UniProtKB/Swiss-Prot annotation:
Region (Alpha C-terminal domain (alpha-CTD)): 267-339
Protein name as annotated: DNA-directed RNA polymerase subunit alpha
GO cellular component: chloroplast; DNA-directed RNA polymerase complex; mitochondrion
Swiss-Prot/TrEMBL catalytic activity: RNA(n) + a ribonucleoside 5'-triphosphate = RNA(n+1) + diphosphate
An example Gene Ontology biological process: DNA-templated transcription
Binding partners and assembly: In plastids the minimal PEP RNA polymerase catalytic core is composed of four subunits: alpha, beta, beta', and beta''. When a (nuclear-encoded) sigma factor is associated with the core the holoenzyme is formed, which can initiate transcription.
Family per record: Belongs to the RNA polymerase alpha chain family.
Name of the top EC class for this enzyme: transferase
């Protein structure tokens, strides 16, 4: 467990992790502070961060299971202690950590008698089991258990939606709960007198082990920033709200629009304020960059072409696409290597 004393800054806004501990493989805790804040700001930030932590962070989970021996969810299989429904509930609880984009396939192939755990799941290298001891089923007889699984990265809660495969079979859907953050709370400490009264925001985060509390805080912060980016340049647009409302939708400010407006008004482009997920990069490319801590244009320009080629899962055509975008919108060429 890591614990630090709380030192309140009287000048610039700062945040710090004051406590960090791992209670188990599937439970991590972190306590953070942000200060100094003006009266009312701590509650505003705390509420927004809590909602972003609980609802805006992506998680990875098993969403479907398929086996020739399983006719439907409420059946039983001779030689297996648990019912099919219990096995599905156990699969639902498996905690996964991944840099996956979209879906992938996994499988279980075991022969009894033995206990089946998360360690028996055969998955791509991009998917890791957080706790390999998580129980799935108990085989009491020398039978084969073969289950095909679908793993998906998403956010929030998804109801079961039955759907047949191309081969005509019917995989059993699993209610997916893609929520890495188990709980989040905030509290406020006020100090000072009169007009000089200030606040400290305390933020507590519990995760399921697929993310550390610090990683969850970082991702939630970026998700909130992304939501507010269109408003940063809203005053530069001549928007007829009445016409827009009659059409039923408001104008969408694209990456190209914002750059054009900045150039038109002769404003310096704040590279650190332009996030790569606002560009026209494909989601898979964006996720590769994000996993390498490249979140803004400034982060991207700190790398050479060779650096990008070394990023895991980033293909040469992805690098060419990035270079084309930099040249097209910024007339910038990344150096081939760092000197």
């Amino acid at each position: 467990m890591v614990r630090e004393e709380v030192a309140v800054s009287t000048r610039t806004l700062q945040w710090k992790c004051v406590e960090s501990r791992t209670d188990s493989k599937r439970l991590s805790y972190g306590r953070f502070i942000l200060s100094p804040l003006m009266k009312g700001q701590a509650d505003m930030i705390g509420i927004a961060m809590r909602r972003a932590l609980l609802g805006e962070i992506e998680g990875t989970c098993i969403t479907r299971a398929k086996s020739d021996k399983i006719p439907h969810e409420y059946s039983t299989i001779v030689g297996i202690e648990e019912s099919v429904h219990q096995i599905l509930m156990n699969l639902k609880e498996i905690v996964l950590r991944s840099n996956l984009y979209g879906t992938c396939d996994a499988s279980i192939f075991v022969r009894g008698p033995r206990c089946v755990t998360a360690q028996d799941i055969i998955s791509p290298p991009s998917v890791k089991m957080v706790d390999t001891t998580q129980h799935i089923a108990s085989l009491t007889e020398p039978i084969d258990l073969c289950i095909g699984l679908q793993i998906e990265r998403d956010r929030g809660y998804r109801m079961k939606t039955p759907n047949n495969d191309q081969d005509g079979s019917y995989p059993i859907p699993i209610e997916a709960v893609s929520m890495p953050v188990r709980n989040a709370n905030h509290s406020i400490h006020s100090y000072g007198n009169g007009n000089e009264k200030q606040e400290i925001l305390f933020l507590e985060i519990w995760t399921n082990g697929s993310l550390t509390p610090k990683e969850a805080l970082h991702e939630a912060s970026h998700n909130l920033i992304d939501l507010f980016i269109p408003f940063l340049h809203g005053e530069e647009e001549d928007i007829n709200l009445e016409d827009s409302l009659n059409r039923g939708t408001l104008p969408f400010f694209t990456f190209q629009d914002k750059l054009a407006n900045l150039r038109k008004n002769k404003k310096a482009i704040a590279l650190e304020c332009i996030f790569i997920d606002q560009s026209e990069l494909p989601p898979r490319t964006y996720n590769c960059l994000k996993r390498s801590n490249i979140h803004t244009l400034l982060d991207l320009l700190s790398n050479s072409q060779e650096d990008l080629m070394r990023i895991e899962h980033l293909r040469i055509e992805d690098v060419k696409r990035i270079l084309d975008i930099l040249q097209k919108h910024f007339t910038i060429d990344l150096p081939k290597n760092k000197f």
